[in-house]
């Protein structure tokens, strides 16, 4: 097998993917987590049709991804506000004005 390809067994099927060597461990771990989530959902819900379970797992993963994107956007906004406040404080300090630190956004 070429160094850029990896075989992953998932749901009893062997799948072959093009994957850079430095990402192969992550791909294997992702496949394992997917199998675990599918198995857990099958056990909890009683749904036996793989397509339905995969659809629900995919929706759950996408929902979690969107939540993380929103958290990242919120964190970015807070950091940008802090940077802006620090920049203003430094400008005032360098110009000799008194500096008041606003801790509301921290």
Curated annotation (Swiss-Prot):
The keyword Lyase does not apply. One of its GO terms (cellular component) is cell septum. Residues 22-81 form a coiled coil. Keywords: Cell cycle, Cell division, Coiled coil, Cytoplasm, Septation. One of its GO terms (biological process) is division septum assembly. Gene3D superfamilies: Cell division protein ZapA protomer, N-terminal domain. It is found in: Cytoplasm. It holds the Pfam family ZapA. Activator of cell division through the inhibition of FtsZ GTPase activity, therefore promoting FtsZ assembly into bundles of protofilaments necessary for the formation of the division Z ring. It is recruited early at mid-cell but it is not essential for cell division. Homodimer. Interacts with FtsZ. Belongs to the ZapA family. Type 1 subfamily. This is Cell division protein ZapA. It comes from Actinobacillus pleuropneumoniae serotype 3 (strain JL03). The lineage of its organism: Bacteria, Pseudomonadati, Pseudomonadota, Gammaproteobacteria, Pasteurellales.
